[in-house]
């Protein structure tokens, strides 16, 4: 007996078909329910619900999200406006980086200095960039060189010492004027020192032309004041103003002796300042000679001087200045002879950044000048810097100061020897004329103040009470 076997049907059973259709529908529901923004899918949504949501999304316009999606690094790098150093107050052009090439004074090579948001005028003068988004930097903190002395006005002539806020405003105005002034034509001569030594390999420049006003009024001042190196008769001292002169004219010309007469006394704090110099050693000379720098030993300018003995750069308030220096005739001979019998101390109202660099060039081994004092060691009175010799910590009976501005030693008038201001006279010999008198003071080995008082009679030039 044969049994018949039936082959399995190739068609799927209804149960399997139903299961497959159910699985396909489930997967399609999940795909439709996935949000486009990356949200998590909802498991409980049915096909009908997903269809409704799909219909709603397709019929409503898309709204911009408050927080836009993150952009890729490439997209962020393209937008340069995202990186700013100052608040954006409006649409402004991108900052331009101006590059200035300046000839190096040392080796003749070209050097580049980058200044942002500022245009550079000739020799360090700044011009504001109108496209800048940041406020312009100011350079009104003080001049590099010895500032011009300010006259006591009727409003502040009774001011106390140390009140330097009004003076800073006046000094700021002077800086602006000095940087805009153009110097007169200079006489062209060879760039050699008084003793014939050339400084062709030196380089620098700094010094605002704050002495331009002094140069113009030099003849007027010297006519009113007798020669400083010759004895002055008491009757030829202070002369009153002419009757026809107006009140305003009386205040136009700076009178150093009127300033000295009305200078306020030192405060207790200023009198008790700690000495700025170290104690003397056994090798230190017994007498001290304090020397001014500008217009006494040298003349410096920010304008190019064709007959300059040397020139060098100075960085001051992020601006590079080129300083041109003239050396007074017999400058080196004077220092070499005086350094053998005096403790030479340089005391200047100029900035240290300029004066210290200049002295490093003139006296690199400090064989001539033992100590250096700068503006920070002065006493500020109504914006004027006075050199109080008490800060030296030396015996004032054996201390001498030489300065072209008598008001600079207003507190120790009997210790001061005035000298004519020097700018460019090649025939000047004022330093040589002082050597015999200074040598005699050391030989006498006495209090120098009576001898200085009798020789120069500066007290007789003070105005009457």
Swiss-Prot record:
Modification N6-acetyllysine occurs at: 26, 57
Keyword Acetylation included in the entry's annotation: yes
Stated family: Belongs to the CTDSPL2 family.
Modified residue annotations for Phosphothreonine: 86
Protein name: CTD small phosphatase-like protein 2
Presence of keyword Lipoprotein: no
Span of domain FCP1 homology: 282-441
């Amino acid at each position: 007996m044969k049994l018949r076997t039936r082959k399995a049907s190739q068609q799927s059973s209804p149960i399997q078909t139903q299961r497959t259709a159910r699985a396909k529908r489930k997967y399609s529901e999940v795909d439709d329910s996935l949000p486009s923004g990356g949200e998590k899918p909802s498991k409980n949504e049915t096909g009908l619900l997903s269809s409704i949501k799909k219909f709603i999304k397709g019929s409503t316009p898309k709204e911009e999200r408050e927080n836009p999606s993150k952009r890729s690094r490439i997209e962020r790098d393209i937008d340069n406006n995202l990186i700013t150093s100052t608040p954006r107050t409006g649409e402004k052009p991108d900052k331009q980086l101006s590059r200035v090439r300046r000839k190096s004074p040392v080796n003749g090579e070209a050097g580049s200095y980058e200044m942002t948001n500022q245009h550079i005028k000739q020799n360090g003068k700044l011009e504001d960039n109108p496209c800048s988004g940041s406020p312009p930097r100011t350079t009104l903190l003080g001049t590099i060189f010895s500032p011009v002395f300010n006259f006591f006005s009727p409003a502040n002539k009774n001011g106390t010492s140390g009140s330097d806020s009004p003076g800073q405003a006046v000094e700021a105005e002077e800086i602006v004027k000095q940087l805009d002034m153009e110097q007169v034509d200079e006489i062209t001569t060879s760039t050699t020192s008084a003793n014939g030594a050339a400084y062709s390999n030196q380089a620098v420049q700094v010094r605002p032309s704050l002495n331009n006003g002094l140069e113009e009024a030099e003849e007027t001042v010297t006519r009113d004041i007798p020669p400083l190196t010759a004895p002055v008769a008491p009757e030829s001292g202070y002369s009153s103003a002419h009757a026809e002169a107006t009140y305003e004219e009386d205040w136009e010309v700076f009178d150093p002796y009127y300033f000295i007469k009305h200078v306020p006394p030192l405060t207790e704090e200023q009198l008790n300042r700690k000495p700025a110099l170290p104690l003397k050693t056994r090798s230190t000379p017994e007498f001290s000679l304090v020397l001014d720098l500008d217009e006494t030993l040298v003349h410096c300018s920010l304008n190019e001087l064709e007959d300059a003995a040397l020139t060098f750069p100075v960085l001051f308030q992020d601006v590079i200045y080129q300083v041109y220096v003239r050396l007074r005739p017999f400058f080196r001979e004077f220092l070499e002879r005086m350094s053998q019998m005096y403790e030479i101390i340089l005391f200047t109202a100029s900035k240290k950044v300029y004066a210290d660099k200049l002295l490093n060039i003139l006296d690199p081994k400090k064989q001539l000048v033992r100590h250096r004092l700068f503006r920070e060691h002065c006493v500020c009175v109504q914006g004027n810097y006075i050199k109080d010799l008490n800060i030296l910590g030396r015996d004032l009976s054996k201390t001498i100061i030489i300065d072209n501005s008598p008001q600079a030693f207003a507190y120790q008038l009997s210790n001061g020897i005035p000298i004519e201001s020097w700018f460019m006279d090649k025939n000047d010999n004022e330093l040589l004329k002082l050597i015999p008198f200074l040598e005699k003071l050391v030989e006498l080995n006495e209090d120098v103040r009576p001898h200085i008082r009798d020789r120069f009679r500066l007290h007789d030039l003070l105005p009457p009470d």
